[in-house]
Amino acid sequence: MYKRQEFSRPRVSGVNAITINEGDELLAARLTDGNNEVMMAIKSGRAIRFPEEKVRPTGRGAIGVAGIEVDDETDEVVGLVCVSREDKDRTILVVSQQGFGKRTPIDEYRITNRGGKGVKTINVTEKTGSLVGLMDVLESDDLIITCKSGVTIRTSINEIREAGRATQGVKLIRLDEGDEIAATSKIGDQGEDADAEIVEGEVSSESNVEATDSTETPNDASSDSNDNTIDNAGDNTSVE
């Protein structure tokens, strides 16, 4: 679910931002001017890009509208970004469960309507594991990767090469058997202000990038309903 809303009178005690259905949870919130483009990604390896104005503003108690169609009950959204149409310096970084990642130009993600299947953003295989993170980055940023074992590395974004959407990317971190990525985050250029506990890392030389063919799957959608119901997209979209 995705929604737009204004917070003109915030209270010290906080306000209700969204109604959460049973079994669901809030993943992310982003500050925006209402004129950006939204990207959402799911762990099965797809992402969608749509204009923010396609989402009508709703009240704080609303559930929101459908942003992207998930594959099944085990699939879920793993990342959300808001990108400016004028910002050509940013790329989209994706990271998989087994430590693979890559950067892809934003323009490789075609603009569609919300609620569709989107397009492939990483080639998910048994080797890569599920998609765990999506973020917009600059070459001057750093990437922080934290593993379930507690190991954390920091590496420069400019060390991660660009690749097409339908590839698995390069190995960003070597994991011990049974370990996997727990969280990812980015930090801007802060000089030498790195945490002493963080191990400075480099992108692995195991840069096996594999391309796959793309397929299209039509998506049917339904019309808008009231603020307290799920709202699906109005136009057909496809997955590549």
PLM regions: where:
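Short, structured "edge-of-domain" segments at secondary-structure transitions
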Residues: 3-240
